[in-house]
């Protein structure tokens, strides 16, 4: 297999693992029962996260997470929105309940990183909201902090490793840390973060894609990553580290679009 073919295979397998619902049903509207955006081993959100976004189909079904980085821009995973038209995507911003609260708004533009699908490690996209929202955006960190840095993951969904439970309505959170890139399989260390699975049984899973990985400033949060895929190529969630798009490393491309 050529290098290009190998990279395409890795990217396709990764997208199928963590974002299978978003990618496979881009032209349809999945029922809630088929969506498995989860954090295994997490807990109900202990605070409000005004920047947290639930990306939804027109029928209100959640399919991916995202982070509000400007009053009218959201960063998410590219595999979440590839093949989707803005008219078929809406966003609920600033609620810990994926079914109510916050601000519900349509979207007007989807921008996929130009290297996504061509090179490993660019699973990042931007979604422009149809109108600005009043929630406070999250700043992008100037540095991811490197291995050992404590981080927090956010997401909705089934908390069972095999995806057999129903998705919770309440936002889940999990405290973890960045680990060396060598701990993850098929990772681009220049543009991605390898993130630990605490206790060997906690972490992100199917459809949790696009949701934020946060770094604490001591008094608030900064964005360092966006959920991408499994780091051990296993179909069972939380059995190994997870891979996150390194938003700090791609901040130049992001700023070029959102200003």
Which residue ranges define each predicted feature?
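C-terminal region of N-terminal signal peptides and the immediate post-cleavage residues
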Residues: 2-8, 15-40
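C-terminal subregion of chymotrypsin/trypsin-like serine protease catalytic domains
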Residues: 3-6, 22-28, 68-81, 90, ...
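N-terminal activation segment of mature serine protease catalytic domains
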Residues: 31-57
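A conserved glycine-rich beta-strand in the N-terminal activation segment of trypsin-fold
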Residues: 50-71, 102
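Structural detector of coil-to-beta-strand junctions
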Residues: 50-52, 90, 137, 193, ...
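Conserved H-D interstitial segment of serine endopeptidase catalytic domains
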Residues: 55-56, 74-77, 82-115, 178
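Chymotrypsin/trypsin-fold serine protease catalytic domain
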Residues: 97, 105-106, 110, 120-200, ...
């Amino acid at each position: 297999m050529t290098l290009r073919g190998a990279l395409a295979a890795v990217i396709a397998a990764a997208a199928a693992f963590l974002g299978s619902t978003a990618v496979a049903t881009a032209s349809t509207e999945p029922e809630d029962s088929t969506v498995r955006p989860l954090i295994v081993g997490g807990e109900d959100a202990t605070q409000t996260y005004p920047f947290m976004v639930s990306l939804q189909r027109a029928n209100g079904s959640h399919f991916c997470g995202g982070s509000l980085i400007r009053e009218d821009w959201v960063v998410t995973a590219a595999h979440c929105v590839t093949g989707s038209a803005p008219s078929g995507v809406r966003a609920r911003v600033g609620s810990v309940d994926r079914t109510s609260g916050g601000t519900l708004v349509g979207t007007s533009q989807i921008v996929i990183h130009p290297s996504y699908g061509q090179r490993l490690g660019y699973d990042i996209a931007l979604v422009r909201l149809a109108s600005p929202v009043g929630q406070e955006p999250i700043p992008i960190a100037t540095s991811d902090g490197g291995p050992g840095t404590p981080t927090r993951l956010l997401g909705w969904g089934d908390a069972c490793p095999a995806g057999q439970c129903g998705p919770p309505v309440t936002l889940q959170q999990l405290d973890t840390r960045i680990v060396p890139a060598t701990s993850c399989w098929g990772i681009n260390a220049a543009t991605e973060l390898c993130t630990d699975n605490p206790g060997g049984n906690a972490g992100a899973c199917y459809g949790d894609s696009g949701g934020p990985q946060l770094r604490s400033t001591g008094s608030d949060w900064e964005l360092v990553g966006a959920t991408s895929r499994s780091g051990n190529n296993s179909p069972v969630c939380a059995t190994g580290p997870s891979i996150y798009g390194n938003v700090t490393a791609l901040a130049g491309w992001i700023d070029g679009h959102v200003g």
